[in-house]
Amino acid sequence: MEHNGSASNADKIHQNRLSNVTEDEDQDAALTIVTVLDKVAAIVDSVQASQKRIEERHRVMENAIKSVQIDLLKFSQSHSNTGYVINKLFEKTRKVSAHIKDVKARVEKQQTHVKKVEAKQEEIMKKNKFRVVIFQEEVQCPTSLSVVKDRSLTESPEEVDEIFDTPVDLSSDEEYFVEESRSARLKKSGKERIDNIKKAFSKENMQKTRQNFDKKVNRIRTRIVTPERRERLRQSGERLRQSGERLKQSGERFKKSISNAAPSREAFKMRSLRKTKDRAVAEGPEEVREMGVDIIARGEALGPISELYPEALSETDPEEASATHPPQEGGEVSTPEPLKVTFKPQVKVEDDESLLLDLKQ
């Protein structure tokens, strides 16, 4: 008994030890699971935060792309406006060049006139003997004075000295020199302006300005839209165009199929004929006579209705014909009785105009 009691005590102690060990292991496992779950939760939170950041970046990128598109539209509008303004400037330069040519021709004419006047003045100054006659009549005096040169001055100057008095000093030379200086100034200023305009609107300068403008435009384009993105946009446009063409083709095919599937007017007419024939057969010979159908037998034999109108009869018509005309014994086919066919005037049957054919065997 004592031995059994000691054995039972030992078993209890061993079981207690095992239970303690299992409890410790369970606690350790629970702790590890909790730590792992915490790590997983931290990872999930970090992933969600990164996803939110990515979404925000995508929104920012979309806004930037929209702003870039708006800038592109504005730039295209400004580019078109600048092109229009440049064309106007070219037209104005052409007009200015034509006006400059006219002014140049006028200046040359004035220059020749001035040279002639200078030559005359030199001759007069060399001789220093001229006379100015001033008189007034009923007509108003002209504002400009005309200097008359007498031929006798060149022939005999000594006789002229005896005849004429000393010339009056009218200080006309000083006035003329002032006018000559003004004309020279105008001439110089006109030439300088013409030269400046020619230099500004020369072919070389215009080509340089065009090249610089094209370079700036290309730089702005490459900064705003890369060539890869431009190629992608072009490909997407081609795809959209192809899809539109396919949709058009499918719509045309659908229309054709509907038009082919729709019954024709002849089919409606044949159906109306069949309905009238069925009504006439159902009503009987008396009602047909009342309607005014005149059937008279003739010597000519007509074939069955299926031969006359093969398209109008349906699949059940041959069966009805076989029921109404059963084949005779010995393989002989019964010939139908002769008929007279009468046509009525046009009558509307179900809103379709057709000729009614009344047949009776």
From Swiss-Prot:
UniProt entry keywords in alphabetical sequence: Activator, Cell membrane, Coiled coil, Cytoplasm, Developmental protein, Differentiation, Membrane, Myogenesis, Phosphoprotein, Transcription, Transcription regulation
Modification type Phosphoserine: residues: 152, 171-172, 354
Keyword Cytoplasm among UniProt keywords: yes
Presence of the UniProt keyword Nucleotide-binding in the record: no
Record's compositionally biased regions (Basic and acidic residues): 230-255
Signal peptide range in chain numbering: none
Biological process, per Gene Ontology: cell differentiation; muscle organ development; positive regulation of transcription by RNA polymerase II; regulation of gene expression
Pfam families documented for this protein: PTRF_SDPR
Coiled-coil residue windows: 100-124, 204-248
Region (Disordered): 1-21, 230-283, 310-346
Predominant location: cytoplasm
Homology family: Belongs to the CAVIN family.
Subunit structure: Component of the CAVIN complex composed of CAVIN1, CAVIN2, CAVIN3 and CAVIN4. Interacts with CAVIN1, ADRA1A, ADRA1B, MAPK1 and MAPK3. Interacts with CAVIN2; this augments the transactivation of NPPA.
Protein name, entry field: Caveolae-associated protein 4
Organism: Bos taurus (Bovine)
